[in-house]
Amino acid sequence: MKHIATAVAVIAGFGALALSEGLGQHSGTHLMISPAELTWNDLPSLPGVKIAVIEGPLTQAVPIMFRLKFPANYQVPPHSHPGIEHITIISGTLNMGMGDVFDRTKTRALTPGSVAIMPPGTHHFVWTSEETIGQVHSTGPWSVTYVNPADDPSKK
């Protein structure tokens, strides 16, 4: 039950952004976006992280794409998502590990151009030592479930 509450809270945090005006919706026409056109918003479910929704909304069962901008020295505890996650590193270095326990010694450094693909439900964690931007592709609705609900950064 705690996992469901966490997922609902995260969807609500993403949903407020996904339903806002911006690039997040289009009518099936060709879409081209430059980095200068992205609108960055605070991400309540990950305090300190910014999100730019490119395609969405994140609350519906549609293709989604968004960028996450992590500050330096940030970490996200072990968690999973209900859909497949494709993440491409745009800038900086995202250190990613797999499993239920956060362990910096068991991560791989993903530098610009690197890609990670995780099946639904894969437990993983990340950390940064510098500002890092990653672009996520998936199918909504998007949510995050923490392995340990007490680790949810939005609750701290």
Predicted segments, located by residue:
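Positively charged n-region of N-terminal signal peptides that target proteins for export
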Residues: 1-4
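Bacterial N-terminal signal peptides
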Residues: 7-18
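A short, N-terminal "cap"/entry segment at the start of jelly-roll beta-barrel domains
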Residues: 19-64, 149-156
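Double-stranded beta-helix
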Residues: 29-31, 105, 125-156
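His-enriched metal-coordination microenvironments in redox/metal-binding proteins
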Residues: 46, 58-63, 77-88
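Short acidic-glycine-tyrosine-enriched beta hairpin
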Residues: 59, 94, 100-121
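Glycine- and acidic-residue-biased ligand/ion/polar-headgroup-sensing regions
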Residues: 71-74, 80-101
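Short beta-strand His + acidic residue motifs that chelate non-heme Fe in jelly-roll/DSBH
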Residues: 76-78, 96-97, 118, 123-129
